[in-house]
Amino acid sequence: MAQKKGGGSTRNGRDSESKRLGVKVFGGQQIPAGSIIVRQRGTRFHPGTNVGIGKDHTLFALIDGKVQFGFKGALNKQVVSVVAAE
């Protein structure tokens, strides 16, 4: 006779792969042109001067320089800019 009951089935056992979103370069850091600054879903951070935005809302540097975070407008939207290195 079997000493254990049958295993049965489960509806668990799967998970989605992490998307690795978030800020990749922080304020004050030097970066080369083309570097990713923020990976995001939607525009939590908006592009400022010398920052481009990809079709998946990724923000990237358009020039070599220093990253700067700030707020803009009446709604205080978070803006990311790149300031040229002196």
From Swiss-Prot:
Keyword entries, A-Z: Ribonucleoprotein, Ribosomal protein
Cross-referenced PROSITE patterns: RIBOSOMAL_L27
Annotated Gly residues bias: 1-10
Region span, Disordered: 1-21
GO CC annotations, alphabetized: cytosolic large ribosomal subunit
GO biological process terms, semicolon-separated: translation
Keyword Ribonucleoprotein tagged: yes
GO molecular function: structural constituent of ribosome
Domain of life: Bacteria
Pfam families recorded: Ribosomal_L27 (PF01016)
Protein family according to the UniProt entry: Belongs to the bacterial ribosomal protein bL27 family.
Protein name in the entry: Large ribosomal subunit protein bL27
Species, as recorded: Bordetella petrii (strain ATCC BAA-461 / DSM 12804 / CCUG 43448)
Phylogenetic classification of the source organism: Bacteria, Pseudomonadati, Pseudomonadota, Betaproteobacteria, Burkholderiales
